[in-house]
């Protein structure tokens, strides 16, 4: 999919690139594509196996012939010996009935070279800023994304934490990376439709739009030690070889029994489960096009619970030019931007008494 300027909107054209994951694995070290081009294709960290915290000793014992080192500062990480590192998915499958172990899957958002979502955010005229509502008692939404920059929409709100600022140029080439500003954009969608929420931001995604099971699981575990939020928003995810959720993610999400977990359904245009969105109890959100039909890139299947606008979405954004950050607005497409729309709806329902409907910005129409 690509984004083109045209009348202030993004023209969305969907296309899949079957060689995209192998190409990514060639460009970035430490990645392996399992079953490239096949029905079990998934992207993993080479030679890494993960196991829930309570089963680390069992996994290390069962897998001792293949394991080089074991790390326990977070979800259990078993590093395989180099000769078998590329076989991590197969090795995990061989013992999966005995211990809940799986490869460390790489999670993705957005990049069109990979999976056909809005190529890059397109600069747009900003809509009116969200109202400065104060909800009492507070309704908290925790966002796991690229971080949150001090955009004028939320920089002076009492909940804003400057330590969560986005890293915009990870490769230090002087240009913002392809998914830079993703978290700031998602937070803007949330505030446009639930302007009184309190946002907690966790920076788990790189500005290239990548994270993995272990990084997300560690962040979820940290969040579970705090007063639990009303809503969690997850904007990235992964496919797995066996189409089952990575055990460490299921284990950590089970720590939030009273929290509504909302997750992007993914942009791979498939019916394969996308994790953690496809977990029972998680609200999986697909993207709808401007006419209300499912967007061509959105994942489909009985595990997708809701659809929300995910094409030409208008929200807050941060850009990088000459090393200087500038704040404004952009249009972008993807299920990542449908998920916060549903999260906002849930957050508004958690407020007692419920607030009046959010006003529509007539001068700047758009999702």
Give residue ranges: language-model regions:
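Substrate-binding/access-modulating region of protease and related hydrolase catalytic domains
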Residues: 2, 205-279, 294, 326-339, ...
């Amino acid at each position: 999919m690509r984004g083109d300027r045209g009348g202030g909107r993004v023209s969305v054209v969907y296309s899949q690139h079957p060689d995209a994951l192998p190409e990514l694995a060639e460009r970035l070290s430490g990645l392996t594509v399992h079953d490239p081009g096949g029905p079990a294709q998934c992207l993993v960290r080479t030679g890494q196996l993960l196991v829930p915290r309570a089963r680390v000793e069992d996994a290390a014992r069962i897998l001792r012939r293949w394991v080089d080192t074991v790390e326990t500062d977070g979800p259990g990480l078993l590093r395989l010996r180099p000769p078998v590192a590329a076989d991590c998915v197969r090795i995990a499958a061989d013992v999966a009935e005995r211990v809940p172990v799986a490869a460390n899957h790489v999670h993705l958002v957005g990049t069109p070279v990979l999976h056909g979502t809005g190529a890059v955010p397109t600069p747009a005229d900003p809509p009116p800023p969200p109202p400065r509502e104060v909800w009492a008692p507070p309704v908290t939404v925790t966002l796991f994304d690229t971080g949150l920059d001090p955009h004028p929409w939320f920089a002076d709100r009492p909940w804003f934490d400057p330590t969560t600022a986005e890293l915009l140029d990870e490769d230090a080439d002087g240009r913002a990376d392809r998914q830079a500003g993703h978290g700031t954009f998602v937070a803007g969608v949330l505030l446009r439709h639930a302007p009184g929420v309190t946002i907690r931001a966790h920076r788990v995604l790189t500005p290239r739009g990548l994270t993995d099971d272990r990084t997300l699981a560690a962040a979820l575990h940290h969040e579970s030690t705090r007063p639990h939020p009303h809503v969690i928003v997850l904007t990235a995810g992964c496919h797995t070889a066996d189409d089952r959720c990575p055990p460490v993610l299921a284990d950590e999400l089970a720590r939030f029994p009273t929290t509504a977990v909302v997750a992007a359904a993914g942009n791979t245009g498939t019916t394969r489960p996308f994790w953690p969105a496809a977990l029972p109890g998680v609200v999986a959100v697909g993207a709808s096009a401007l006419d209300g039909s499912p967007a061509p890139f959105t994942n489909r299947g009985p595990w997708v619970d809701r659809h929300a606008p995910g094409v030409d979405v208008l929200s807050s954004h941060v850009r990088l030019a000459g090393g200087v950050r500038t704040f404004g607005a952009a249009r972008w497409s993807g299920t990542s931007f449908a998920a916060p729309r549903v999260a906002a709806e849930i957050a508004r329902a958690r407020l007692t008494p419920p607030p009046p409907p959010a006003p529509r910005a007539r001068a700047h129409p758009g999702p």
